[in-house]
């Protein structure tokens, strides 16, 4: 998508086996590109959330397996790499899906061919993610158009970040919004701040604004009030994992928005590629592993101070 009129991707690779990502922990205050040069770089990028979003995690992990094979293509090392990558963000099923497919791909391959086979898989997955998200956008555009009333502005609420920053390009939940904007539809987005990591405030509001899409940042608990007062026409969110029965596991807070939408008779949509569906699960409650992250993500808020420095500020009592 566009950053100040220039087309960008959240992850980019080239024929020289170079992989470049955006350090999303610095957004919206600093746009910094980082080159991933090793398996450990990829693990750190996922674990520390330089990259995030289920589809992007899957692509990044695939390149991580390439680096693992390049460094040591032995079966033992690659099995260890598989386990380490799975542990970085266990909720996102795209991660597991991509890695399991890589293991199957190289199972009987000659050792010296493994790195190139994995690189080819990763680069194709990168391109496939873009194609899938574009198609999600096309389908979602039809849904948006069906909810437009009397040529008025259509107000869409979204939670967390399921845009191009999460999916190489286009995004899932935001792809239909970008397609609508590009078509000239008067679309406005209510952006949940999405505590504790504030992906909505830091990422969704940033990428929508950079593309020119009208949006308003709201606190997480404002959605129900807006719905009660007729200011939300529809909701679109992404998914970290969806079961075969349709249970959706997404960023904390999504369930409450779904309940509010249901109570106010507002359409609620989830946008996702097939790789986000876990066909081995029929129920999401208590069956999907939910990662537990550091308490500092709640007690500290990251931002920019009056000196222009990015820093953390403590907002709670000492525990």
Give the ranges of each region predicted by the language model.
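A short, flexible beta-alpha/helix-coil linker loop
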Residues: 27-28, 65, 162-163, 241-243
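Positively charged, low-complexity intrinsically disordered leader regions
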Residues: 1-40, 44
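Short beta-strand segments
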Residues: 22, 60, 157-161, 236-238, ...
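Conserved phosphate- and dinucleotide-binding cores of soluble alpha/beta proteins
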Residues: 186, 194-319
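Short, glycine-rich nucleotide/cofactor-binding loops
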Residues: 33-39, 161-167, 244-249
């Amino acid at each position: 998508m566009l950053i100040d009129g220039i087309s960008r991707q959240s992850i980019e690779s080239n024929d020289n086996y170079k992989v470049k990502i955006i350090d999303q922990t610095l957004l919206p205050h600093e746009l910094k590109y980082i080159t991933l040069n090793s398996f450990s770089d990829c693990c750190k990028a996922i674990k520390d959330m330089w990259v995030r979003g289920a589809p992007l995690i899957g692509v990044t992990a695939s390149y991580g397996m390439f680096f693992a094979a390049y460094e040591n293509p032995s079966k033992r090392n690659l099995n260890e790499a598989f386990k380490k990558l799975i542990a970085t963000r266990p909720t996102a099923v795209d991660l597991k899906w991509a890695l399991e497919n890589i293991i199957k791909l190289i199972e009987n391959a000659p050792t010296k061919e493994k790195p190139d086979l994995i690189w080819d898989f990763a680069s194709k997955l990168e391109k496939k993610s873009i194609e899938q998200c574009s198609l999600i956008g096309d389908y979602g555009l039809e849904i948006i158009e069906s909810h437009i009333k009397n040529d008025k502005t259509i107000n869409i609420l979204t939670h967390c970040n399921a845009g191009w920053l999460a999916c190489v390009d286009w995004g899932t939940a935001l792809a239909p919004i970008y397609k609508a904007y590009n078509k000239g539809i008067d679309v406005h987005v209510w952006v949940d701040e999405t505590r504790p990591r504030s992906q909505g405030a830091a990422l969704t509001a940033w990428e929508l604004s950079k593309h020119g899409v009208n949006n308003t940042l709201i606190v997480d608990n404002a959605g129900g009030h807006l719905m009660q007062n007729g200011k939300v026409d529809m909701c679109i969110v992404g998914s970290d994992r969806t079961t075969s029965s349709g249970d959706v596991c997404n960023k904390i807070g999504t369930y409450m928005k779904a309940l509010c939408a249901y109570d106010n008779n507002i359409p609620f949509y989830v946008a996702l590629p097939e790789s986000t569906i876990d066909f081995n699960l029929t129920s999401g409650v208590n069956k999907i592993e939910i990662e537990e992250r550091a308490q500092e993500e709640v007690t500290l808020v990251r931002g920019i101070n009056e000196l222009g420095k990015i820093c953390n500020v403590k907002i709670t009592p000492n525990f």
